[in-house]
Amino acid sequence: MKFTINFSANLTAFLLSVFLSVWMTPFIVKTLGVEAFGFVHLTQNVINYFSVITVALSSVVVRFFSVAAHRGEREKANAYISNYLAASVLISLLLLLPLAGSAFFIDRVMNVPQALLADVRLSILIGSVLFILTFLMAGFGAAPFYANRLYITSSIQAVQMLIRVLSVLLLFACFAPKIWQIQLAALAGAVIASVLSFYFFKKLIPWFSFRMKDLSFRTSKELFQAGAWSSVNQIGVLLFLQIDLLTANLMLGASASGKYAAIIQFPLLLRSLAGTVASLFAPIMTSYYSKGDMEGLMNYANKAVRLNGLLLALPAALLGGLAGPFLTIWLGPSFSTIAPLLFIHAGYLVVSLAFMPLFYIWTAFNQQKTPAIVTLLLGAVNVVLAVTLSGPAHLGLYGITLAGAISLILKNAIFTPLYVSRITGYKKHVFLKGIIGPLSAAVFAWTVCKAIQFIVKIDSWPSLIATGVTVSFCYAVFAFMLVCTKEERQLVLKRFRKTKGAVNL
């Protein structure tokens, strides 16, 4: 029941983020211009490079707290959060100077038009405050995770998104539109989210109290040592996820990176959805590990890969299959020429993102060294390929996209299931089974998209939405009849009858 509630809340938050992106992007592009819009994401990417330092703590505190609390070791769990809070304050103070320096020297790192330089610098300064606030509050995310009430996190994220959008509209209406106003709006949303996170932390974990006697170098060292490989991994993640816009800016110019920033939002939303849904399976997998139930962990992990893949296959197929008409209707005919980029993104994301729930297995086992090294190496491969293919090979934005596709498939679809099978002691192919159903469903949905376009001209929002609904219905029937197990079909029918009975009442 909790999984259903958590899943529904996460799906609602994702749909809200899609709606807000579709609605806000054309507005911001038209208001600020394509070049300026590119710097909205680029400035945040620059700030996120500092997460290499902060992730050493933030990536492990939730896991350490949850395992200790599930085992009844409340004193130990209390100490983990207390040490995290103290260490995060100290690290934040140390980061103030380099964050400020990145703002003032940004024009030496990337191509920034002189007319936008002051705006970009102020945007980075405000974004730095947002970054530090998010880091400080990360420890309070342990409460919903420990209680397996992740719908609380999704609800807070939804509120944060709404506050951000409303703040952007208000600032643009009251002042001359600038890039920094978007960061200020994001900061306003983060402040509200922080207040809510703290409230629910105290409500879900009333036994926690910050005590000076819990602060110890030994506990902090334990967190840092466990998170050290997370920092190495984060370097690789940044080389995967947040180097493409910088590469486009340096190799192809501000205009090309602005266009790429507009369309890259949807692949990023798919990644976000995959990560969010994968996290829903993490509490149960952590619980299986804590109890030493490896058979249960293996079965649940395979189910997680298949369900995560099924959820991603539909939006990915819609994104790739309807890329041309979608970009034309959404941003104008000038963007339709880069529609194949979305098709490439959709194709490799279906294959690679389905395996993300498996990340939480090596986190539970505290076996992060090898994944971190592999992520770092393949992240470097991604950068080399992106620069080579976009520049010397003259493939432009397509080179950057292909580089990401090759690197991410190698990391997620090949290395991840093989490594997880090794640390759990199972055969190499065990964790590859879950991808077959989602992949076949994605191909089916993409085929339906193309078939409809041969019959009907899609040139307006109503026709695009109608096509999306039709494809979704066909996909649901295909997945229900051919991909879901007999037990899952019975469960769906049982809940449908229960819902129908409640409505009739």
UniProtKB/Swiss-Prot annotation:
Pfam families membership: Polysacc_synt (PF01943)
Cellular location(s): Cell membrane
GO biological process assignments: polysaccharide biosynthetic process
GO CC terms in record: plasma membrane
Induction remark: Repressed by SinR.
InterPro entries: Poly_Biosynth_Transport, Polysacc_synth
Membrane topology recorded in Swiss-Prot or TrEMBL: Multi-pass membrane protein
Protein origin, superkingdom: Bacteria
Transmembrane segment boundaries: 9-29, 49-69, 86-106, 122-142, 156-176, 181-201, 235-255, 261-281, 310-330, 341-361, 371-391, 395-415, 435-455, 464-484
Keywords: Cell membrane, Exopolysaccharide synthesis, Membrane, Transmembrane, Transmembrane helix
Physiological role: May be involved in the production of the exopolysaccharide (EPS) component of the extracellular matrix during biofilm formation. EPS is responsible for the adhesion of chains of cells into bundles.
PANTHER family the record matches: PSMA PROTEIN, PST FAMILY PREDICTED COLANIC ACID TRANSPORTER
Protein name (record): Uncharacterized membrane protein EpsK
Organism: Bacillus subtilis (strain 168)
